[in-house]
Amino acid sequence: MNTQILILATSAFLCVRADKICLGHHAASNGTKVDTLTEKGIEVVNATETVEQKNIPKICSKGKQTIDLGQCGLLGTIIGPPQCDQFLEFSANLIIERREGNDICYPGKFDDEETLRQILRKSGGIKKENMGFTYTGVRTNGETSACRRSRSSFYAEMKWLLSNTDNGVFPQMTKSYKNTKREPALIIWGIHHSGSTAEQTRLYGSGNKLITVWSSKYQQSFAPNPGPRPQINGQSGRIDFYWLMLDPNDTVNFSFNGAFIAPDRASFLRGKSLGIQSDAQLDNNCEGECYHIGGTIISNLPFQNINSRAIGKCPRYVKQKSLMLATGMKNVPENSTHKQLTHHMRKKRGLFGAIAGFIENGWEGLIDGWYGYRHQNAQGEGTAADYKSTQSAINQITGKLNRLIEKTNQQFELIDNEFNEIEKQIGNVINWTRDSIIEIWSYNAEFLVAVENQHTIDLTDSEMNKLYEKVRRQLRENAEEDGNGCFEIFHQCDNDCMASIRNNTYDHKKYRKEAIQNRIQIDAVKLSSGYKDVILWFSFGASCFLFLAITMGLAFICIKNGNMRCTICI
């Protein structure tokens, strides 16, 4: 009877499940992958796209003082062809140039056109001041059918000076203008190249013509070059425009004896603006700070893959269409194989048997925190998130996107338009430089994101380690690590006890005596799997030896007492 009681008690003891607490992290079967410095395609719980690909096909002008130049070219606002009459003076912080816009009416070109265009794009608008030039002995009303209003006319801001009579003498003249303003003045003038020598003589008289312009920082002489050219707008002549920025209190002087297109008013820049070239429709219902020829880029991302020539407060252009920034930890979802393994192991080791490493594996459904606990005890099983470690990781990860933006965003200016023959070389250099910058920034972007991803994954693993160490230091000798991110507790630990472990208020001294007793009992019956077979064979051999000894002893006694006779025949 006593033997039966002992066997039942031992069986009952072995069947009791040990209380256990495990640590893990959130997992989600989402397929979100990022690249790090050392590995590509690492799946993470959360990630944010850093490359903008969405374009608004409109010019978002809400909240901006916008001017749409329409048929007027930006440079035309300085010299005043008929199509620019309404834009001779304006104020704006967003200037829109259209493809149909034209800077001139009489054929010609601007010297250093792109520099002048950049100045005007950033000008904030134009205001003008009369230069006060008066003329005697010449006509100031030169006009052409190429610049028609109701009839033949000329540039509104320029004077075409002609001899008083056809073939008449053009007197030598000198005119001066002093800039009395506090800001630089934009001064522009023209040189007329007649369609023939005969035409030049008719307009300005015979002899060589020379125009000289000088200031404290500028000096240049110009000689007209008459001759036949292909007709444009019915004209075989050309007018080339030149310009300078005149400092405050400086004086510009003009000396000429014909073929001179004189300025009438000096231009002053109003402030700051953004100039764009686009045929996209204006939209006053949306706001934007980054523009390109196809519309507006509205994004708070650090990179964009829409247009390499976007201007304004824009994300950096990169060649990559996607660069994912990790904002969560490494993800190991509970796939079907994992769940089948979990079910199989639960039969042997309970709820937590499937966990093969608390950093490498996660739990789906832990949505209220990144890190958490699972426990089992006499009251059942439970899961709880750890908010402190979660918040610590989030605080360090939050702002990664903003830091990338700070490293990459800046105001871009558009250096792009038509170049004359000499400026084409400059244009090629600009384009080559731009392409090189794109290559560099595409590499930099990939590197920056990879560095941040590496840091994020290392950081989240580090927080997991901290949480694990916190639990281990609390439990001390009252529990044993099982190597799978779990602790087997050697005393009864109810839900309040489990909560104290999670809250870092666990008192290991309170349970020490019970834990030591249970540890001794458990250690006494624990057998390492490597010695089980040896012990079994030893036990079997000892049993056989004992059985043989008893049998031989009984036989010897029986023979001695005459109860058994042994006959040996030879």
Curated annotation (Swiss-Prot):
GO CC entries: host cell plasma membrane; membrane; viral envelope; virion membrane
GO MF annotation terms: host cell surface receptor binding
Signal peptide positions (record): 1-18
Cytoplasmic side: 555-570
Subunit structure as annotated in this protein's UniProt entry: Homotrimer of disulfide-linked HA1-HA2.
Protein name according to UniProt: Hemagglutinin
Superkingdom assignment: Viruses
Record family assignment: Belongs to the influenza viruses hemagglutinin family.
An individual GO BP term: fusion of virus membrane with host endosome membrane
Residues that span the membrane, as ranges: 534-554
